[in-house]
Amino acid sequence: MTEFHSSCSRCVGRCFYCGGKSIKHGFTKENKQRYKCRQCHKTKVCSYQYQAYQKYINPYIISLTKEGLGIRSTARILKISATTLLKRIIRIAESIPQPSLKFAKSYEVDELRFFIGRKSQPRWLVYAIERETKQTACFYIGKRNNNTLNAVIKTLKNAEPTAIFTDKLKNYKTLIPKHLHKTSRYQTNHIERKNLTLRTHLKRFQRKGISFSKSSRITTAVLRIYFWGR
């Protein structure tokens, strides 16, 4: 429970959102004392009964998502609604900035096939990793066409890479300049190994499993947390 130390007759503590002074602001339906910040005007109570309002929930959501738990599994462990969890995942993902690409680096690009809702709706996850750091540089989800591939390739070309390594998929030849494109054997080992890790951690990408995605938006948010969340 948060303790408030009074410094005047009205101010009862500091706001943990902005650090401003908080004052009493009536009571909740459960007869709990409410507090309001005089600076950001946000309200709070000392202790929340619903777990989703706890400050530690968001870090737990990030941690459990990166460990590969599904939506309902995470909701059961944290004792919150699955609907609330979906909204929170989207909000967390939107707050995670995409890392800036470094200039004059080499990248590996590969694609994973999965489906949304049913197997008759296949999708591609196309992403790139920097060869030196092995970190994910960018990714895109879409249908199996050049537009999906080009969304990643175009981002990499803006960073003026020294080389882009891919498999021998014919689509890449029309998208990547010849002097940058490399398709030598064993040159995509790092991203191929990352594919295995990704399929192991996130069940929706497993080849033969009963888990699947219902929404491209949620899948994009989960990947953003998995790749760049901390």
Regions found by a protein language model. Name each.
Residues 1-230:
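Residue-level recognition of single "structural anchor" positions
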